[in-house]
């Protein structure tokens, strides 16, 4: 992609991207602060609250990093050096991977928490946070190693004229790699993402089947007219299904745009669309948590009430 074409990119795309980043940073900050305060105020915080707090922190850092990259894409005069380019692009790639990993593990932990109360599952529930934490550390090391090639393939190119370089920002470009090297780095990442998305789909499907069976048992034992209010389990199911469906749709759209960019090699608009889709989940999912978890709303209502009383 030529830098001149990037500068002529539709201004609407720039506004959408900066608006998305700003809204996402605000929403994740609200979610993170609420969960940290609730965790510090409890003697035994729930594992799910810890993972939601970590997910919101990861997404917050991801969007801040993307904001810095977007500034260099549209507003900067190309003043970054190679170290800055490599560090920020590497950090952004790492945070993207950790966000996907944290979302997957949170989905699994949520499924385990809502599973049946058999002896095996109850015993596993107590150990699951430790297993999931170990899995997360493993994926952290894996992501760091998979993204390490960016330190040699990202360079600062302030006066880019060659079409061989791949545009990243006004300051940074990606060195062209051979087909074998590209496959060596892209294949493990594709397998990793497919594995995590498959785990999310399986855990969500299992939980939906589990709660559907629970609902049938409840209808058999009790009259459905006793209460029309949704149970906490049903609300949790709706939340997970909504997040999972939204994630899958964005994942499909993002990959479709990516392959379209490969076909139309000089697509500055497609580049912006891919970036917007890539960060839409990190922007939207905090609102889903805030709207579906009543204790977060009550927390902020109490804080706002105290400020008003003062």
From Swiss-Prot:
Role: Putative pheromone receptor implicated in the regulation of social and reproductive behavior.
Glycosylation sites: 159
Protein's GO biological process: response to pheromone; sensory perception of chemical stimulus
Membrane topology per record: Multi-pass membrane protein
Regions of this protein lying in the Cytoplasmic compartment: 42-50, 115-134, 212-238, 290-310
Extracellular topological segments: 1-20, 72-93, 156-190, 260-268
Gene Ontology CC terms: plasma membrane
Family: Belongs to the G-protein coupled receptor 1 family.
The protein's name in its UniProt record: Vomeronasal type-1 receptor 40
Designated gene of the protein: Vmn1r40
Main location: membrane
Pfam families registered for this protein in UniProt: V1R
Residue ranges crossing the lipid bilayer per the database entry: 21-41, 51-71, 94-114, 135-155, 191-211, 239-259, 269-289
Location of this chain's protein in the cell: Cell membrane
Domain of life (superkingdom): Eukaryota
Alphabetic keyword roster: Cell membrane, Disulfide bond, G-protein coupled receptor, Glycoprotein, Membrane, Pheromone response, Receptor, Transducer, Transmembrane, Transmembrane helix
CDD domains: 7tm_V1R_pheromone
Magnesium in keyword set: no
Single GO molecular function: pheromone receptor activity
Disulfide bond entries: 85-172
